[in-house]
């Protein structure tokens, strides 16, 4: 029985008895088993008993590993020094592996890579598979620190293969988790989160490896999913305390997470010279002094502090300066804070419309840029920041490559619709609406919106007329609406108008002539025998097997895509909403990768949260419901929709009684 492959069984089956040699073996097995379970204090006690019993060098090696895991580097090195004179062959190679791991922790990645590369050759020669995996993992960590991400991923993959072959599936799952960390460094947050999830499913036990929770929380926070990040950090903190492990970045990460969730308490308690925490403490003059020097994020925080200490005119100028800086360097934080501050200062209808648009588009996509050079430059910049190194030259590289790459996805050019427009915006609990009709803009407060939405949804569910149009919309047959807050849940088409619902003005596409289109039909698990076969028979087109790769390939360049699949909405970040397919979820970020997104999408079996991902990718119109749709009524409803699909806003209107609306530009000019 292997103490590493099945540590719990080892603990249950092992007794410290017999001869001196048998007792020493038992103590060593128990120590290693408890290391695997993250019980470092217990593991250390068994190893110390073995050391007192025999003085064998293997116990020094085990204690060196335990102390390294605890962050006690000097004690770990002392054990290695004591063991060194007694080591030969395989044991000596293991000690060299531990010294290589020390170099990783000492932020000397190139020395660590060289040392571990030599050790890997030795361990392969001895056939020491478990320690070979240790060395590969260590070299992968060193290559992460050196921003050699492809090679790091290869090392973690190789270690995963070795560990699976010797039956250490929990540690193999940790290697998959490490590959998620590589994806996070590369800027691909969705891939990072997917690998973290896959690692957990593969057997990664976060109770014995709570640092995995810290990695996951960091990715969630970077993706803007602050609530989820805080949920993950809370048990991580308790587990690390129980395991007597020190993760220095945990307190800072926890404070940042709380700060971005509106709780400055932890940041104020940490204090120090961190600019973000100084801003939370109200030290505006000190932070504003950073707006002309230092890393981009520090300068942007300086402009935010300048805005907070200035009069209205100066504050708006400071917000614009901070946003220009972030635009030049593809920066994110504190973009949303800058736009929120400016929105609070906006007075006229045009100002509110402008800053509301800036605020709506203040979330950066968690996808890596399509230009490999830019992706690499951003990776190098992230690592330099993490290690406290110089970043100004790297920021210049990012700016240069960003300007050369340009943007992809939603167009940056804003075209105001010729139709009447209503832009709703919530700021500090207050709902306001900017109405633009015939070029004239008007600003007004909109009270009791939650009640209006609730009454409208109840009316639709009961089959009654909805009476909220007068309170929300101008007197026009056709209107463009940009909702905010609870109004995202409004069944807009049920208000008796032809309503185009868009996330922001950047999503409006001028109407264009219809053209022959390719139709794609997709039915998810449990819905294969519902409306899709009948629709395909009437309208033609291809029916696609509900596997993610097949679905994505079929959607490229399609005219109309009909998806009958259940889904789940993530309100914090729509790119993490998903559809359920046979091989797992199809995320919004998968849709965002489409080079040629479909023209029109119909989501017949899930609520409208995923519409945003299609519109961000470039789809012109999405027909979806804000209410659960009874399966018994879907088939007849979808027949009516597809007979009018060339005019999506009219197609949505005929099924408004089921809560469907048209998201995007739902008008075309007939051929």
Task: List the model feature ranges, each with a label.
Residues 8, 276, 301, 312-496, ...:
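Amphipathic alpha-helical protein-protein interaction segments
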Residues 14, 18, 34-35, 54, ...:
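Eukaryotic all-alpha helical interaction scaffolds
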Residues 22, 55, 91, 131, ...:
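Structural signature of alpha-solenoid helical repeat junctions
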Residues 25, 58, 65, 94, ...:
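Residue register of alpha-helical TPR repeats
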Residues 482-560:
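Catalytic-core domains of enzymes
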Residues 484-486, 533-609:
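Catalytic-core segments of thiol-dependent peptidases
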Residues 569, 575-597, 631-671:
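Caspase-like cysteine protease fold
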